[in-house]
Amino acid sequence: MSHEHPAEIVHQLQSIDSIQQDLADTAAAVVDAASQSLPPQHAAQDQKSHSTLLDNAEAMESILESAIPAAPGSSSTAAASDAIGDNNFTASGPPPISNTVVAPSAADDETGDVIVVESETPTTTNVVEAVVNPENDGDVPIESTEQSSGQPAEQPTEQPTEQPTEQPAEQPAVETPQAPQSTPAAPAASAVESIPTTLEETHLEQIVQAPAPTVHTEPLTPVVDIKMEEKPMIEHVAWIPPQGIHSDVFLPEGLTEYSPSVSQNGELIRSWRADPSNPTLLLSLFNWAVQKTEVEDARAWYRVLAVDNPTAAQPLLALINLELALSNFAEVEAIFASTLKGSAGITTAADVSIWAAYLHYIRRQNPLTEGSANAADVRSTITEAYEFALRECGFDRESGDIWDEYIKFVASGPATNQWDTQAKNDNLRKIYQRAVCIPLNNIEALWKSYDNFESSLNKLTAKKYLAEKSPAYMTARTALRELRALSDPIPKPILPPYPTFTEQDRQVVGAWKACLRWEEGNPLVIENHELLQSRIGYALRKCLGEMRHFPELWHYAASYYSKLGKQDEAAEILEAGVNACPKSFLLTFAYAELQEERKAFPTCHSLYTTLISKLNPEVDELRQNVAREIDIARGPPIPGSEKAAVAAAVGDSIDADGNDISDIQRLVEEREQRGALVAQRRGKDIEELMVGISVVWIMYMRFARRAEGIKAARGVFGKARKSPHLTWQVFEASALMEYHTNKDAAVAIRIFELGLKQFSEDVDYVIKYLQFLLSINDDNNARALFERSVVRIMGDKARPLWDAWARYEYTYGDLSAVHKLEARMSEVFPEDAPLKRFAQRWSYNGIDQIAIRDLGFNRARMGVAAPPAFAIAPVLPPVHASIPAPIAVPTPVQPPQESYKRPAPEDIPPRRPSSAEFSRSPKRHRAQSPPRRYPERDDRPPPGRYRDSLPPVKAPSSIPPPPLAGPAYATPSSGAYGGDKDRSGLEKPLAWFMAQLPNARSFDGPVFRPDDIMKLFGGLSLPGAGMPPAPPISRGPPPPPMQSRGYYEPERDRRYGGHGSGRY
């Protein structure tokens, strides 16, 4: 090729730019026209063709760019360019094309586009070779005609070429993994043949006039995506669905990324993929499809929604109406066949609206034309449909309209002779008599219609028939009022609710149980036992349909059938309940027990393993949620924490940036503490779930031992050990099972030791192991276990272990061993009072006579008054020494109460003998109180503290002086209050606390009336708590003492010099 003038090169560049613009406009026009003209269901299929056409244009554009000749600097360079421009290929393979990754921009991130990598500018020969060679292929694979037809491609002949003076730098090889098969197909070989090897102006015109390359709808070879690490400029971008839609959760069957409900609801789809089991999101997508009349989308979303909510009536009714509106009768019949089961099974649709839609469809498909040849057959078909529907839902009080339609349909029948008229009247009478005995919403209208019907036939016989059914009608009308009172408060949500264990849930469950018990009580006095069972069965099905996710109600229904001896019906209920509540322990265990009684052992194995497989992912998901909560609680990392750690390691107080590491370390510690608090709080939830899984394993082992022997139980234990969510209860249960089954302690000890390797720091497990060793009188191993464990378990966590071993030593050890143990315990727990440990040594099985007889805890607990002796009260701090006696002020005198409804017992002291004595608490006996700021409000006497529970008593004319500070407490106490009460009548600890409060003179804030404050507190409405009842006049015994590990704890240790828990 001769030396080209720079002006020619510029002209070529301008021509190439024009070609690029034309190709881009053409590709965009093709895509826009296709997206507007094609229906939605064909969009996914034709998108491949359009993408392939676009990629072909981009490939041609890329080749044109890369073939721009460089301005030769010398004659040798020009000769090299001529040699490179030859059509022959070199024998050696083409050099690899440099491919690098381009970082997507912000706009690219929003649309999730795939980045097609631009190549650098190799020679034209290398470009064509790279296009044909699939090994160096990028996003646009191009095959030759021979390769596409299955024949081998012709190899290029080897001809030496002169190398140019400036060779492009060799780039590293690029990894080319397999791409999805949805990538656009490769163009035909004609596209490759049309690509020129030189870029003279004559060839440019041929390229523009060349026909469009052939587009294949299916890829000929797997397309290869190229993964690169560098970041060149972005040149070409191929559109794919947004990244937010892509997830591991697949779309429902029948939907694609281009379905209307998916492509036009990006936010809903992303939310659904984040939580696929959320019924609210599924219902929103289903409603959108129904509103937009997208029947394919509506079917797909309903199938997903019906997996957990097959008894939801309103979505099913909406789908039926949509199918009927589009005249899709085959789909409507399939829906009715799957939902309207005539066997009265638990999955039968129990909503009247579904049965009304069914009858509407039957009458629409069987139009009745009087006088036609098939009129009798059509009328018979409609009659059978009404009987079928009323047999299933005729007990519902909402089915009154169906009864009325049935009556009108029968009454409209032809009667050509007297016999037909009599038969029709008899049939109408039977239908009326069935309807007026049911508590329907329109029962009064039906009774009036029945009255008119009988009267129109014969007034003499009308009285007879009406008198026969009048008692049943009156009973049904009364029952309707009762049923409305029971069922009207029950909410009727669109989807069956999930239990939240709130008070509202308990009320709803209680309301349903009240309705079911009302049905079981036979309020309609139905004498036909089968009819009564049918009515109760319908009530149970309706309850379970609307409360599908409440295991308690499933168990209630199964128990009802079990009481009747109908084990098959009970098994059907429990099986449906397990399907509805797959994580229910109640239903799984109940169904497994029933199947075990019926010797259906394979079903039992499946139930236990299925429940475990359902619970394991829940633990993993909870752990991930807890980890995220911990990260959120910690917050962002502390800046400079790494440098502070390095400085602290070498002993510096200032890091490399000159910051004080103490402040940084404090912030780091606070950050870790926030995370630790969340981990501690949420860790209990994880442990609770893991314990639940272990309980299932234990129940599984029990079943295996009962059904198949101890070897089967060992096999289940072996499977349980492989569980990642195992707790120590499984080891304990297996060990005790081995011991009590085979009476072999060695096997049990080996199992305990096996669990000790994993739970050696769990004090509860160590105590269980220790108790087992002591129960089999293996004190040597027990002592060794105790010594090993107290080394591993440190601090207060080991306190239960010390107490368990101390009880054994106190009971069966010698005195020297007891003293040694107490010496060790005093070192580990120095805050314990010696009296406590001494009393524990001399107690038996929780009976502590030292506390009862010598320390008086029995009297304190039982509330027995002390004998009338000079009981000395404990001397409290002299808080009243500097307080002068209050000045007596006149107070209004209350009129005496003349009578009482019920006098208080004489042997029990009154809680408030007088307002004077009642006001002798240390807090109230203070110096002069400041006068009220609002004396005009004191227009009534101050009410007593217990004005609601005790009658008013006469108040003295003045307040007596308070008792002297200090020595006043040594005066003889009143026998009415006993040794546990202050002279004011309050408990001594409360009186002491009130004495420590500051004096009223130190208060300088606003003064409120006590009545207003009490009214404010009395009007509070706390959630989950009501107002406590008024205190009784007579004092009863206190609640029983709390029982801890082996002994009672009447009081805290601080009474006797200690600070720990327990009596002492």
Swiss-Prot record:
Q: Where is the composition biased (Pro residues)?
A: 1026-1042
Superkingdom of the organism of origin: Eukaryota
Instruction: From the UniProt record, list the HAT repeat ranges.
Output: 327-364, 377-412, 423-456, 673-706, 777-811
Compositionally biased tracts (Low complexity): 66-86, 151-191
Where is this protein localized, as stated in its record? Nucleus; Cytoplasm
Q: Which UniProt keywords are listed?
A: Cytoplasm, mRNA processing, Nucleus, Repeat
Disordered: annotated span: 34-106, 119-192, 888-985, 1022-1064
Q: Where is the composition biased (Polar residues)?
A: 44-54
What biological-process terms (Gene Ontology) are attached? mRNA 3'-end processing; RNA 3'-end processing
Sorted alphabetically, which Pfam families does this protein's record hold? Suf (PF05843)
Q: Which Gene3D superfamilies match?
A: 1.25.40.1040
Coiled-coil spans are: none
Name by which UniProt lists this protein: mRNA 3'-end-processing protein RNA14
Q: From what organism does this protein derive?
A: Cryptococcus neoformans var. neoformans serotype D (strain JEC21 / ATCC MYA-565) (Filobasidiella neoformans)
Instruction: Show the taxonomic lineage.
Output: Eukaryota, Fungi, Dikarya, Basidiomycota, Agaricomycotina
Gene that this polypeptide is encoded by: RNA14
